[in-house]
Amino acid sequence: MTLSGVAAQTLRDVQVIVADQSQEPVTHSQVVQTLGRVIEARGGSVEWHSREPIHGIAEQRDFLLKRASARAVLYLDDDVLMEPWVVERLLDTLDSEHCGFVGAFPAGLSHLDDVRPEQHIIEYWNGPVSPEAVDPGSPQWERWQLHRAANLYHVSQSIPRDALPRLYKVAWIASCVMYDRLKLLEVGGFSFWPRLPRYHSGEEVLVQNLLMRRWGGCAILPSGTYYSQVPSTVLNEAGTVDGHALDLLAEMIEQYTRMAPTVKTTT
């Protein structure tokens, strides 16, 4: 599903890096092979990496970042489908706003009839995206509620077409996120992965928090992305995680943002 969306993008010159930790390599699928050929025929390239052992999602992201060479890197989960314009809009936004990252959060359309107006609170960027410190537990941290169920989709459907697209503020964003590669490296990337247990979460929450403090971050509305809601692979047998990357936040703020310009604090 994910490669189908990549193969249909208006932006064709893409370097796709697939880091596969499936029990059966995805390249055994004729459909997957065909989609890879379509991407190449349209002017892109595809690298296939079947990887063992499994150290967790932060290590996967670290591996992918080390393989990347473009100025912008898109982390795309393997259960996300993009509309054809998404990558181009993300890149245009990253270029125009000069921020650390831009996201396109996917809607879970199984929640299409689950309308939650109390969670439809959205803060727009009405000017240039700018640095901000969004601390855990602050009122701004509650922005994450917008990314539950199909909330973002419902918000986008309630806005007149001529008022879109818009950029909005986030606490963090997952599943489809484009980063400025050099800025991501300036805050250490995902090199902290050896300090986390195998089953962990929050690796993107951590790096995005650091990036927002120095350069800001945002997300696009409408997002143009949808996810299939398949079971997560980051959870242990009990259905939980053994550690969260945000436990490292305080020391990484000191390490990577202490020499940066003062930012607006939103606590």
Regions found by a protein language model. Give the residues of each.
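Glycine-rich, basic loop-to-helix element that forms the pyrophosphate-binding segment
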Residues: 51-68
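Conserved donor NDP-sugar-binding/catalytic core segment of glycosyltransferases
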Residues: 85-144
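Short, high-confidence coil segments that cap the C-terminus of an alpha-helix
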Residues: 70, 97-99, 215-216
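Acidic donor-binding segment of Leloir-type glycosyltransferases
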Residues: 5-49
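A recurrent flexible, glycine/aromatic-enriched loop bordering the glycosyltransferase active site
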Residues: 134-154, 158-179
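C-terminal catalytic/acceptor-binding lobe
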Residues: 1, 159, 165-182, 186-267
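The conserved acidic donor/metal-binding loop of glycosyltransferases
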Residues: 77-81
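Short aromatic/hydrophobic "clamp" motif used to bind/position activated sugar donors
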Residues: 73
